Amino acid sequence: MAEAPAVPMGGAGLRERKIQASRTQEPSPPPDSLMSKMRTDESSKIESENKTFGRTPDGTVFTVPHTRDMVSQLLSPSEPKNLSDILVLTILALHILLLRSLPASIRIPVFAVIFLSWRAAYNIGIGWLLHMQSNHRTLVLWARKLRLFVDPATGQNPHPLLYRFIKRELETKIPEHYTFESAPIEYNTWLVFRRVVDLILMCDFTSYCLFAVACGSRPIGEGLFVMMLRWLAGTSLVLFNLWVKLDAHRVVKDFAWYWGDFFYLIDQDLTFDGVFEMAPHPMYSVGYAGYYGISLMAASYKVLFISILAHAAQFAFLVLVENPHIEKTYNAPPPRKRVVDHDTALHEDVGSRSNSFNSDTTPPLPVPSTTQPRSTHALVGSMDVHRVTDVSVLLIHLLFFALTIITPSTPAYQFFFVLNAAVWRIWYSAGIGYILDRQSTRKSWTRHFVKFGEGQDEAWRQWKGIYHLSMTTCYASFIAAAWKMYTLPQDWGYGLAILRHVLGASLIALQIWTSMSIYESLGEFGWFFGDFFYDESPKLTYSGIYRFLNNPERVLGLAGVWGAVLITNSRAMIFLALLSHTLSIAFIQLVERPHMQKLYGRSLRRDAGLVKSIKRSLPNSLKQFQGSVDKILDESIEFVEEVIDTARPKLAAGVNTFVKDTTALLHKYPARITITRLEPDLAGYEMKDYSLTVEGTQLAQFDKSTDATNNKSRNSRRSEDLVLEYGAPIKVKWTAPLNHSKKDWIGLYMVTHNSSREITKVSSQGRWIATNEGAFDSLTSEVGLKSSDVIIKYTGNDNDKTREVASGEIIFSGEKLWWNQGVFEFRYHHNGKHNVMAISRPFEIRIAKFDENEIPLDNYAVVRPAIEGALLPIIQNCLDRDPDIAPQNAEEAFGSQVDRDSKYTKRVVFAVQHMFGIEFAPEVVSADGNVRNLAWRICNAKKVLAPYSMSRASGATTPVQED
């Protein structure tokens, strides 16, 4: 179910359009007729306002009829039934009959296979169809290609019986505001797709329930109270699941329930309340609580494990299918900023003060920054052995791992590991909390670095390293302690051993997901408490997991700690879990909360979405009781804070005295894939009529070399060689016989990839374009197709008589290129197979090296414009020459899509490395934001790396020791 709201697209203007009154004076109607007309007009107005308007990708606007939900259509006696309903109900009945007829010994494996098959049809089958529809509009192309919805009266529908069957099926289900013939093809395709979804979803749920029935039993020795408790909990989860589904359908209707936005959009805002304020993606998260309720009632680990597998498959469906479509459809990149980054002015100012990169030039003082720093080398989620923080973390973790594995699990070592974990937890919460509190009130951390001539950015970098090291070591020590306290169960079938491990692993997975969601919402800046260090204008937003919870780390962020308690079943781990939870809550209340109140004030939200949903469902008496409890808790917290504030000066004085005394005493004493499909019969196709001609932007200059032999050989070949710019679009003109197959296609390959000139044995990896429109079930195969089957006069290369052939033009650009240097060729293939009919002349794609011979690298004012001039065209190529992304000059900022898709920055750093011999991380390109900043960075890198440069340009090179 696509859960993102549709973007309004001018529907209000369409609904509110007024028709101009006639100039002719009409006679006044009688009063009764006038009142009747007014009531009719009012009714029509209300009806019009209640209508929903849809919009297809080509801009067609239509009225979206009202449809009923799946269960009502199938099971309600009042709803009209058609043949597809009878088919679905028959298949469901066959499932039930199969359960009753099978022997008890094979019921469980048979229904496990049946359920997993239907689940695969759901997550893999429907997922593939939706993926293809989202990216290539495949389902609509199939319908158009088969002419399913073309009226047979026109004589163009080859399937008139199927047309009448589909028409009868759909019009039976939608009796009002729907006409099969006039509905857009996208809407009709969606309705047919719905019927397939109904079959799969109903069979999926039915087979799951029947599998649970087959596995259901009462555990041996289970008491009546435990059984009643198990059934009560299971029934509650199933009822909760039912409420989630009903409330979700109330909010999103059939449009999102059946993934309607993969086919068309609706012109209205969808409001998300109820269950959508409770949890992210409720249909796929809390919406599967019923699976675990049924597992409880069945008292079967088989049902539990297959439920976990199905739930995991559903999350994979969400991540791989729905989320990319939602991101593409509703989260379009913002327009490009036309204002040059303020850092550019700073760079220019530095350049104007000093026109040369002299080594004795005094570096400018760091400029204090009050805005949020932009991360170019994220600390979380990346390991770089060139950073002292990462090396320190790696070495400490290796030490913990070695000590944990080598040492025995005796009581003494267990005590040591638990004590070590407790100390690290105290430091992580209390020690880090103290540093942040001092930073919030006095800027103590920043003042320390300013004292020694460093800037705020250096203080921020060092703080991130300290926090990252403390956090990772805290959890590493906890894992080591859990390992020492854990013992394998002697009998997995005894007691709740399996259940403890399953629940524990689930809680650990929940904490990992929560941490990832928090980092995704806060980013690097928020993860490391950046608002304690940078005083930017307070702007508080609640997105991601914070839409549902104010402090997710308070409960969900420590779920894995309690998961370890369940798995180890150890009192020592209970102590560590209680200590961790207590210190984390204290950190939130005593450090984070006061700083947030000081920084954001009244803009802080009191209740999160989950709390609001729960409060709305409470009766008035409980609401009043809850308000009283909140008041008591707030007053208690304020009292504790007052006590701490009062005692703080005395404690500080005592600590200072202790530090002074201790200091006095001490003074004394960190592949290739081979895919070949061949056409068996090529008779009737004139091979000499096939040809390929390559055109493109030729490289303006060749690499210079002092090697005279190489220069001579290059100059002799320049008239023959075709050398094209890196990333520039390549035009291919083709010819073929008039009877050539409409499924011919042209692919781009490296010359060295195919040894045969008759057969292509290597996959094009998506770098191919069809010669004719509509021949393949993919729109991406037509991206770059400019013309086809244009009849021209053709002589060929053998001076034969002139003959007529079909011709066309295609352009390879963007993802159709290899984005690499080398020698390439185009291959013309026959009838969707891999028979080669023609091969283009080989051509080379090369990145011209920056010429340093004639440019004085010591003069910044000269070298920077030269670098900008060399960078601009190749960066425009790397950004697909898209006017919304690629800059038109050195000062213009890159489009926001560069930050969202790493492929652009990877292309740029590849080009920079081969042009200038300097390797940058892709994040550097995003951080610089325009050509001028990147050129400034290259200039500095050239200066820093000059003693190690291997170029033959004038200037400093690597010193060579003379004998």
Curated annotation (Swiss-Prot):
- Does Lipid metabolism count among this protein's keywords? yes
> Which domain of life does the UniProt lineage start with?
Eukaryota
Transmembrane residue ranges: 86-106, 110-130, 196-216, 224-244, 278-298, 301-321, 388-408, 415-435, 465-487, 492-512, 572-592
Keyword annotations from UniProtKB, A to Z? Endoplasmic reticulum, Lipid biosynthesis, Lipid metabolism, Membrane, Methyltransferase, Phospholipid biosynthesis, Phospholipid metabolism, S-adenosyl-L-methionine, Transferase, Transmembrane, Transmembrane helix
Output the Pfam families linked to this UniProt entry: PEMT
What's its EC?
2.1.1.17
Bias kind Basic and acidic residues: ranges: 38-52
The record's section on InterPro entries has:
Phopholipid_MeTrfase, Phosphatid-EA_MeTrfase_fun
A single cellular component GO annotation: endoplasmic reticulum membrane
Protein's cellular compartments? Endoplasmic reticulum membrane
Question: Per the annotation, which location comes first and is thus the protein's main one?
Answer: endoplasmic reticulum
Q: What is the recorded membrane topology of this protein?
A: Multi-pass membrane protein
Q: Which GO terms describe its molecular function?
A: phosphatidylethanolamine N-methyltransferase activity
| Pathway noted in the entry | Phospholipid metabolism; phosphatidylcholine biosynthesis
Q: Which residues lie on this side of the membrane: Lumenal?
A: 1-85, 131-195, 245-277, 322-387, 436-464, 513-571
Biased composition regions of type Polar residues, renumbered to the chain: 352-373
Q: Which reaction does it catalyse?
A: a 1,2-diacyl-sn-glycero-3-phosphoethanolamine + S-adenosyl-L-methionine = a 1,2-diacyl-sn-glycero-3-phospho-N-methylethanolamine + S-adenosyl-L-homocysteine + H(+)
Q: Report residue spans for region: Disordered.
A: 1-59, 349-373
Family statement: Belongs to the class VI-like SAM-binding methyltransferase superfamily. CHO2 family.
Enumerate the HAMAP family for this protein: PEMT (MF_03217)
Q: What does this protein do?
A: Catalyzes the first step of the methylation pathway of phosphatidylcholine biosynthesis, the SAM-dependent methylation of phosphatidylethanolamine (PE) to phosphatidylmonomethylethanolamine (PMME).
| Name listed for the protein in its UniProt record | Phosphatidylethanolamine N-methyltransferase
**Taxonomic path:** Eukaryota, Fungi, Dikarya, Ascomycota, Pezizomycotina
What is the gene called?
A: CHO2
